[in-house]
Design a protein with these regions (language model features):
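ABC ATP-binding cassette signature C-motif
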Residues: 1-70, 157-354
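Coupling and communication elements adjacent to P-loop NTPase active sites across diverse families
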Residues: 60-175
Length: 354
């Protein structure tokens, strides 16, 4: 939890030896890292500084790749246009009408005819040289561009109630221990609510009571819940992943593809069977499914666990773009800062709203 992470950061900050660590926690990386080793495509690349410095360097690299690719496309287009023009000129110089062919070439015109042949050959030679330059252009990979996620307006989000969930005097005990004690809170429409607190404070229990429709919790009639639990990613299905998701949504294939692309799935991955996915890939599909199903309130219990940084950032975009209400637990401070519009703390079984 937050308190123990800060203690760990303090301990490691004053440690005099070398620390080599693996983490997807951006707060932790920013506090401790002096160098970052990025492992990608079988290679390791070193960046100096903490995570924020790493991000700035990555953005610069991305912009450089974009500029190089843009210049490559510009040069290639210019050469192709020049090649087409020279080809047309060569063809025009070689064109002789039927009437001209039937005419007997006089000695006085012979020199002019030879000159035309010379011009034609020169133009063809120039065109060939331009084509060779095109072939010699180095292959430049297209810079990856992020696609902004936009969820269209949908009637499923019209709940006609500014507080679709009201909790009144919710009490819950387990094994003679009171976990939630007369909790009272209203969940506003379309808010992104972070549920924070120490380990064991009752955050997951709180979400479970909402999911179970505890008698002390009142729902607007049109509420439809979607839930994600820790380790909730075991999908048993032999359908291709694109087909699997399209069967579970009213959104267009374009939107589903854009979500999959943002989660790192390329065109060649879309026919992969659900049952063949790795654990990390299955988590991505489970989360994507939540945001495209006809839900209007989503409960997420520690969704960033087991996710790499790129997927965490994609999830941040999904939550921010989502038009419904999201209630989530997370110990990832950066994640909370990025997406939460409201933060609720659980302490000693009580709600502290901040």
């Amino acid at each position: 939890d937050k308190e123990h992470r800060q203690l760990l950061v303090a301990d490691l900050t004053y440690y005099y030896g070398t620390v080599l660590f693996v983490s997807h926690d951006r707060f932790f990386l920013n506090q401790l890292a002096e160098k970052i080793w990025e492992v990608s495509d079988g290679h390791v690349k070193e960046y100096l500084g903490n995570y924020d410095a790493y991000c700035r360097q990555k953005e610069l690299e991305q912009q450089t790749r974009y500029n190089v690719y843009h210049q490559y496309q510009k040069e290639k287009k210019k050469l192709q246009e020049s090649y087409t023009k020279k080809q047309a000129q060569a063809q025009k110089s070689s064109h002789v009408s039927k009437k001209q062919k039937q005419k007997q070439i006089k000695p006085s015109r012979l020199a002019g005819s030879k000159q035309k042949d010379t011009v034609q050959k020169a133009l063809q030679k120039q065109a060939k040289a331009i084509n060779a330059r095109i072939d010699r252009l180095p292959d430049v990979a297209q810079a990856k561009q992020e696609r902004k996620i936009i969820f269209p307006t949908n009637n499923q989000f019209s709940l006609y109630n500014p507080y679709p969930i009201r909790i009144e005097n919710l009490t819950f005990a387990y094994e003679n221990r009171t976990i939630l004690n007369q909790v009272n809170v209203q969940i506003p429409l379309n808010e992104k609510i972070a549920l924070c607190g120490k380990n064991g404070a009752g955050k997951s229990t709180f979400l479970q009571q909402i999911e179970a429709c505890h008698p002390a919790i009142y729902f607007s009639p049109k509420v439809r819940l979607g839930t994600y639990h820790q380790l909730d990613y075991r999908l048993k299905n032999d359908e291709p992943l694109l087909t699997y998701l399209l069967k579970r949504t009213n959104y267009s294939e374009k939107i589903v593809r854009s979500l999959l692309y943002r989660l790192g799935f390329q065109q060649e991955n879309l026919q992969t069977k659900i049952s063949s996915l790795s654990g990390g890939e299955a988590i991505k599909i489970t989360l994507a499914q939540l945001f495209i199903e006809p839900n209007n309130i989503i409960l997420l219990d520690e969704p960033t666990n087991f996710l790499d940084l790129e997927t965490i950032q994609a999830l941040e975009e999904f939550i921010s773009a989502y038009q419904g209400t999201v209630i989530f637990t997370s110990h990832d401070e950066t994640f909370v800062e990025k997406v939460a519009t409201r933060t609720i703390y659980l302490e000693n079984g009580k709600i502290i709203d901040k």
